[in-house]
Amino acid sequence: MIIKNAGQIITFDSEGNFKLIKDKSIVIENNIISDITDNKNNDDAIDASNMVVMPGFIDSHTHLAYAGTRENELYMRSHGQSYLDILNLGGGIHKTMNDTESSGEDKIFNETIKRVDESILNGTTYLEIKSGYGKTINGERRLINAIKRIKSIYRNVKITLLAHAVPDNINEYDYAGYFINNMIPAFKNDVDFLDVFCDAGAFSRKSTEMILEAGVSSRLKLKIHADELKNIGCIDLCKRFNFTSVDHLLNTRNDQLNYIKDSGAVATILPVTAFSLDSDYVNAQRFINKKIDVAIASDASPASYNSNMIFAIYLAVRYCNISLENAIKAATINGARSLKIDESTGSIEPGKNADLIILDIDDYKKLPYMYMSRLVRYSFINGIKIVDNFNLIH
């Protein structure tokens, strides 16, 4: 297959710097990018004249798998109630855990696949999907099975086992023990990562450490939600654990940045959540100045019902003190780094999987400017067309 006459091709050089190639063709053979060359043609060539070809978005942090909705919380927040206020009233994560725990696998799958389809239509070609809304081992099994069914359709899915919240009326350390003794052994062979929500209203630093130790013993790669609501010392755990990414970081102090840098973790910022919760945005440049790789992800969830990575890029450029070029890098190759898949995807270069999108714009600088428009004319996952003329192909 050939993508010919590409007006602009976005990729990155060997040092990871943004690189723009104009008026070239991309040759794809056996679902792999084989060449970027002078314009070629064949009967099946896709004409990308006056369009932008770029790596598909790597949405490296999502909570897309669940049952139920939480639209009432929008109106609660509009009347001044905070995330923690809603949580303490039995809403937030607790409501979704109850809804998901009481739902069958088919219901979870049918609701989740619709959200995944929306993400794909907006240019995502690789997804991480977390569990975490099942209170019991059976609830988590239904959730993880639903995610595995989605992976059988789209292939480019990583699964994360998430210690998300302590169910109502259960002691935190008792539940951490339940998670360690039941969840991790049951699912360690079904998932790619272990994640813990370490924050006020979730897991304390001590119980987080206990869960992470069990993850290490089970040879799981680690992630952590940290410093979203308050700074309770979770980032200090970078000194002990090898995280692939540390995510949220709204309240991370400057003196803690070296812990992230020294660990080699990717710092994932989630501007759509800041928008949805009307909270402060992360200053991404603080991390970039420390030579820390920054990723952008959607954090799509019942609290922030938006998986549009183009909107995430818009918010990052507008509010997170990051250039458009670095934001695109954060939403592609750095997202791939956070999932340990950057050797095979996240950039357009020979030898990598053909995970790419063709945008119906003539200049990449219009990407965040036109964030409310349908921009993804074509999308390819592993060289297979999944969006054709703005329509999804299953």
Swiss-Prot record:
Bound cofactor: record note: Binds 1 zinc or iron ion per subunit.
EC numbers for this chain: 3.5.2.7
Broad class of enzyme this protein falls into: hydrolase
Binding site for N-formimidoyl-L-glutamate: 133
Xref: Gene3D superfamilies: Metal-dependent hydrolases, Urease, subunit C, domain 1
Binding annotation for Zn(2+): 61, 63, 225, 299
Keywords assigned by UniProt, alphabetized: Cytoplasm, Histidine metabolism, Hydrolase, Iron, Metal-binding, Zinc
Essential cofactor(s): Zn(2+); Fe(3+)
UniProt-annotated location(s): Cytoplasm
InterPro entries assigned to the protein according to its UniProt record, in alphabetical order: Amidohydro-rel (IPR006680), HutI (IPR005920), Metal-dep_hydrolase_composite (IPR011059), Metal_Hydrolase (IPR032466)
Binding sites annotated in the UniProt record for Fe(3+): 61, 63, 225, 299
Residue positions binding 4-imidazolone-5-propanoate: 70, 133, 164, 228
GO biological-process terms attached to the record: L-histidine catabolic process to glutamate and formamide; L-histidine catabolic process to glutamate and formate
Keyword Zinc: yes
GO function terms (MF aspect): imidazolonepropionase activity; iron ion binding; zinc ion binding
Any Pfam family the entry gives: Amidohydro_1
Reaction(s) this enzyme catalyzes, per UniProt: 4-imidazolone-5-propanoate + H2O = N-formimidoyl-L-glutamate
A GO CC term attached to the entry: cytoplasm
Metabolic or biological pathway, per its Swiss-Prot or TrEMBL entry: Amino-acid degradation; L-histidine degradation into L-glutamate; N-formimidoyl-L-glutamate from L-histidine: step 3/3
Family annotation (SUPFAM superfamilies): Composite domain of metallo-dependent hydrolases, Metallo-dependent hydrolases
Family listed: Belongs to the metallo-dependent hydrolases superfamily. HutI family.
Function statement: Catalyzes the hydrolytic cleavage of the carbon-nitrogen bond in imidazolone-5-propanoate to yield N-formimidoyl-L-glutamate. It is the third step in the universal histidine degradation pathway.
Name of this protein: Imidazolonepropionase
Organism whose genome encodes this protein: Picrophilus torridus (strain ATCC 700027 / DSM 9790 / JCM 10055 / NBRC 100828 / KAW 2/3)
Highest classification ranks of the organism: Archaea, Methanobacteriati, Thermoplasmatota, Thermoplasmata, Thermoplasmatales
